[in-house]
Amino acid sequence: MKENENQRIRLSKKMLKDSLVSLLNTKSIHKVSVIEICHAAQINRTTFYKYYGSQYDLLKDMEDDVLTHINDYLGGNIDYTGNNLERIIKIITFINNNLDLCRTLFDNNIDPDFPEKMFSMPSMKQLESEYGGSSSAYVFNFVTDGSFSIIRRWMNKENRETPEEIANIFNGIIMKLLPNATFI
């Protein structure tokens, strides 16, 4: 979220986002109308159009928020020579704290390009450069697709492991497959 947004704007946007997540649990983004979003959020359409041009713009804003948070946990103040586990725990905890939103965004029926957007972040693309040669793209796809599948499976379990437990599993798999990995 933008730092210059006041509390009222943030609340309106949150209500719109929560309403879209709720609606996407029952229908595709293509069948959700702005009127339905506004009705569910109890916000008029003028307010909606003040911030977004369509339901797709709202979805993109939601995706951008998640990608920004994940990218912040991957990079920023975290030392890349440090332990991968700390970064994984932060990402899994963020997903756990925003489970409904992440379940919705990680559902391939909503935006099939979301996994690609998530793993094309500069901090994730670092993996490709670390494993040069003709196999680097395959290694990157293997790790990213597998990571995405693990996260989706974990999110959809009824009795999920704690973020720390799944992060340990995740980190263990990565360290066995790529013992020199420092990309996350």
Tell where the protein language model's regions lie, with residue ranges:
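Helix-turn-helix
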Residues: 23-57
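N-terminal intrinsically disordered/low-complexity leader segments
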Residues: 1-9, 180-184
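Basic, amphipathic alpha-helical hairpins
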Residues: 22-29, 72-73, 98, 127-131, ...
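Hydrophobic alpha-helical segments that form the core
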Residues: 136-157, 161-177
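Amphipathic alpha-helical packing segments from all-alpha helical-bundle domains
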Residues: 108-148, 179
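N-terminal positioning helix adjacent to the helix-turn-helix/winged-helix DNA-binding module
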Residues: 5, 12-15, 135
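Alpha-helical structural segments
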Residues: 11-22, 26, 40, 57-76, ...
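Hydrophobic alpha-helical connector segments
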Residues: 75-101
